[in-house]
Design a protein with these regions (language model features):
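Acidic/His- and Gly-rich active-site-bordering loop/insert found
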Residues: 30-109
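Acidic-enriched catalytic cores of C-N bond-cleaving enzymes acting on peptides and small amides
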Residues: 191-195, 212-244, 250-251, 259-337
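Zn-dependent metallopeptidase/amidohydrolase metal-coordination segment
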Residues: 24-30, 329, 335-355, 401-465
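Alpha-helical metal-binding/catalytic segments enriched in His/Glu/Asp
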Residues: 98-145, 181-183, 199-204, 211-231, ...
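His/Asp/Glu-rich mid-to-C-terminal helical/loop segments that flank catalytic regions of hydrolases
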Residues: 131, 216-234, 267, 310-328, ...
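Acidic/histidine-rich catalytic neighborhood of metal-dependent amide-processing enzymes
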Residues: 106-193, 209-211, 328-332, 339, ...
Length: 469
C-alpha cells in the first residue's frame, strides 16, 4: 500500500510540473507574441511616416489596415476610424472594452507607440469580449475627433483605456486640465536702416505634446526671443524683420526662425554674439537632440522691418511670457506647465499661441491671470480660445484594481498609479459617459510591450465561461 501511495504521489508531482511548465510556456508565448508583433506594427508605422502627412492619409492607412486584417471598421464624418470585434462565445458576459487612441499628422511620430498598441489589440485580442478600437483624428492636438465622437461607444459598463504617447510611461486615474491661448498685436513697419540681413534658425526638434520633459526641451521660439533680449543687453542694435515658428499652440514647436537687420559696422559683434549663443545652446541640448541644428546665414535685405516702438514691446512680451515648469509641490512633483507653441504674422499682426496644463484648478486660474496681465502691460490682445477640464477617478475602484492585478500577472511587478499633468482624451470620454470605467495610459517604446500585455491580460481575465467543443 505504501508503494502504491508513493507511485501515486510521484505521478501527481510530475503532473504538477507539466502543468506549471505549460502555464509558464503560455505566458512566455504571449509575451513573445506581443513583443514580436507590436514591434512589427511600430516599424511599419515608422516606415510609412513619410507618406502619412495628412489626416486623410492616416485615416486611409488605418482603414486599409483593418480591411486587410478582416476587421470590421467604420469611418465617421470627422475622420474617426472605429474598428470593432465581437465577443467570443466564452466572453459573451464580459464587459465591453474600448481602446481610444488619437492620430495627428502634425505630430505623427509621437503617436506611433500608442497606435501600434491599439493595432495589436484590435488584431490579437485573444478571442475575448466585445472590443472597439477607436482612432480619433486631431490637427495640432485640438481633440477635434474625440469631441465629435458619438457617445454610443461608451456604455455604463465599458472599460476604457485612453492611449497616449508620453515622455514617462505611466497609468493614471487623474489627468490635468488645459487652457489654450492666443496673444496678438498689430505692428507698424518702416524701411530698414541697416545694410546687412541675417536669418537665424533653430530646427530639427521632435515636437510633441508638452509634458514632463518641458524643463529640458529647447523651445526654439522662446530661445530666439531670449536671443533678441541678449542682443539688447549686450548693446547690439538690430531691426526685426520677421519671426515665425511652430504649427500649433498645443504642441512643442519643432523649429523657429527670424530675420534681423544690422549695421554693417556691427557684423563682427553680431557674429561674436551668435557664436557664443550657439555654443551655449549646443552644449546644453545637442546631446539629447542630435538632429537639432542652430544656424545663421546672410539673406537679401528685406523691404521693411518692425518699428523700434513695436519691436521693443514685442520682444519684451515674448521674453516675459510663461514657458516651462510653472509649479511643483513640496515633494517636487510636477503640477503645472506652460508652453509657447507657435508664432506667426499675417496682415500686419503677430499672433503667439500657447497652452497651459495643470492638475490644480487654482494654478490653472493663476496661469490664465498671469498671461492676461502680461498682455495687458504690453497692450497685447489676450484670448483664451479653448479649455478642457481635468479628469479624475478612484484609483481604488474595482476597475483600477483589476488593471493593476493584470499588470502584476503579466509583468510580475507592482503598478503604481501616477497623476498625468498634460490634459488627455480621458476627460472627453468622461464627459460622454461618467459611468464608464476610464484609465489613461501614457506610453513610449520602452514599455509598449508590457503595457499591451497588461491590457490583453485584463481582457482575458474578464468574466467568461468554458465552451465545450
Amino acid at each position: 500500500m505504501k508503494k502504491l501511495t508513493t507511485i501515486a504521489l510521484l505521478f501527481t508531482m510530475i503532473g504538477s510540473m507539466f502543468l506549471l511548465s505549460a502555464c509558464g510556456e503560455e505566458e512566455e508565448d504571449l509575451s513573445s507574441k506581443i513583443e514580436e508583433k507590436v514591434i512589427a506594427y511600430q516599424t511599419d508605422l515608422e516606415d510609412s511616416a513619410s507618406t502619412l502627412t495628412s489626416t486623410e492619409a492616416i485615416r486611409d492607412y488605418l482603414s486599409n489596415w483593418a480591411k486587410s486584417k478582416g476587421i470590421k471598421y467604420s469611418v465617421d464624418s470627422h475622420n474617426n476610424v472605429i474598428m470593432s470585434v465581437n465577443a467570443s462565445k466564452e466572453y459573451k458576459e464580459a464587459d465591453p472594452t474600448v481602446i481610444v487612441c488619437s492620430y495627428d499628422a502634425k505630430q505623427f511620430n509621437n503617436n506611433i507607440e500608442p497606435m501600434a498598441m491599439a493595432l495589436y489589440i484590435a488584431k490579437n485580442n485573444e478571442s475575448t469580449g466585445k472590443l472597439d478600437v477607436i482612432f480619433t483624428s486631431e490637427v495640432g492636438h485640438d481633440y477635434a475627433g474625440i469631441k465629435s465622437l458619438d457617445q454610443k461607444y461608451f456604455k455604463d459598463n465599458s472599460n476604457v483605456f485612453c492611449l497616449n504617447g508620453g515622455e514617462k510611461n505611466m497609468w493614471s486615474t487623474s489627468t490635468g486640465a488645459r487652457s489654450s491661448y492666443t496673444f496678438s498685436n498689430n505692428v507698424a513697419y518702416t524701411a530698414p536702416t541697416g545694410e546687412k540681413a541675417y536669418k537665424i534658425k533653430i530646427s530639427g526638434l521632435p515636437g510633441g505634446i508638452p509634458d514632463s520633459k518641458i524643463s529640458s526641451y529647447p523651445n526654439p521660439i522662446k530661445e530666439l526671443g531670449d536671443l533678441l533680449a541678449y542682443f539688447k543687453t549686450n548693446a547690439l542694435i538690430y531691426e526685426l524683420a520677421d519671426i515665425t515658428g511652430g504649427s500649433s499652440g498645443n504642441l512643442y514647436p519643432k523649429s523657429s526662425s527670424m530675420t534681423i537687420v544690422i549695421d554693417e559696422d556691427d557684423i563682427d559683434k553680431f557674429e561674436s554674439r551668435m557664436e557664443t549663443a550657439m555654443e551655449n545652446f549646443n552644449d546644453n541640448y545637442l546631446e539629447d537632440y542630435p538632429e537639432m541644428t542652430y544656424t545663421y546665414e546672410e539673406v537679401p535685405l528685406p523691404e521693411k522691418v518692425v518699428t523700434e516702438e513695436y519691436q521693443n514691446e514685442f520682444v519684451s512680451m515674448l521674453y516675459t511670457l510663461l514657458d516651462g515648469v510653472y509649479y511643483k509641490d513640496d515633494d517636487d512633483n510636477l503640477i503645472s506647465i506652460t508652453s509657447i507653441g507657435a508664432i506667426h504674422s499675417k496682415d500686419g499682426s503677430y499672433t503667439i499661441s500657447a497652452v497651459g496644463n495643470s492638475l490644480s484648478e487654482s494654478n490653472m486660474s493663476e496661469i490664465d491671470t498671469t498671461y492676461k496681465t502680461i498682455c495687458g502691460l504690453s497692450d497685447i490682445r489676450y484670448k483664451k480660445y479653448d479649455e478642457q477640464l481635468g479628469f479624475s477617478s478612484d484609483m481604488e475602484s474595482e476597475f483600477a484594481k483589476a488593471v493593476a492585478a493584470a499588470f502584476n500577472k503579466y509583468s510580475d511587478a507592482d503598478m503604481e498609479y501616477k497623476d498625468c499633468v498634460p490634459a488627455t482624451n480621458a476627460s472627453y470620454v468622461y464627459e460622454k459617459n461618467k459611468k464608464s470605467n476610464i484609465i489613461n495610459v501614457s506610453v513610449n517604446e520602452d514599455k509598449m510591450e508590457r503595457y499591451t500585455g497588461t491590457i490583453i491580460t485584463f481582457m482575458m481575465d474578464q468574466t467568461h465561461t468554458e465552451v465545450a467543443d
